[in-house]
Amino acid sequence: GIEYCKNLINLECDFNAITSLDLSGLDKLEYVDCSYNLIKTANLSGCISLKQLYANVNEIGALNLKECANLQLVQAYKNKLTACDVSGMSKLVYLDVSQNQLTTLNISNCSEMLIVNCGSNKLAALDLSGLEKLTSLGCYNNNLTTLDTSKLPEMSFLECYANSLTTLDLTTNSKIATLHCQNNLLKTLKIETCQNLTSINCSQNSLEGELDLSSRTELRKIDCGNTFLTKLNLTDCTKIETLNCNNANFSELDVTGQPAMTELNCRDNTLTTLDVSNNLNLETLYCQGNPLTKLWLAEGQSISTLVIDNPDAIDYK
């Protein structure tokens, strides 16, 4: 058997019908790809040189990685893991255990960790302490009610959508560029210091009042629809390309300073006037479900898709 291959360094056995994998004692093994099999049990004890593990799309129920202290990358998405403990693994940089059945995940004190994806599990809590270098976190589609990112100063990518979060405070995460926090229970979203945003989706939440995105000069995509927001501040956001603010409580919407915008969905609000005459790149406009009395367009402006309840409201500047 493979246990006698004591000098084995690389093992690629992906896309087979393997049901169990015993690599115990292979202390020179550095690379394993056993993805797309039927593996239920995997023994990696004594694999002290292992650096990269790809075990995606199997049926693995438990994975003990504690003896693999040199691991740098672990991919084990789409398995049947219920728990995963990689705490204190100081060389681990990348971890993807998404699409499992995890109820516990211990990733604390992985001092070199850059990327974690633990989305689509059953996590009710997530300890992010000791991950000061983390740049990307995917914890979407879990059972999280709180998320403390205060000790992640380098984080630029966060996907925490489809949880039960009521508050998200990103005050200390000033490098955030991509934020997807839709489909939660958010009433509070603190992003005042997040001036590097390029994409934000905070739709399907309980947000009220004003969403102030002013001075986000690199912001290109916004989705704040299906909320209770009443005001949107886009001052100096000149690079916005798509804006979705449908089904909110906006009675006014100023997009005159967004010349790069190609798509606007503001349907189902309480807008009475809308001026898109400065949005000469606009290709798609959904503004139905508003009591519009005036929609301002520019002379000769060409919008390929325009949906409006009252075409008589259209006028030209």
Which positions does each model-derived feature cover?
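Conserved hydrophobic beta-strand positions in leucine-rich repeat
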Residues: 11-13, 30-34, 51-55, 72-76, ...
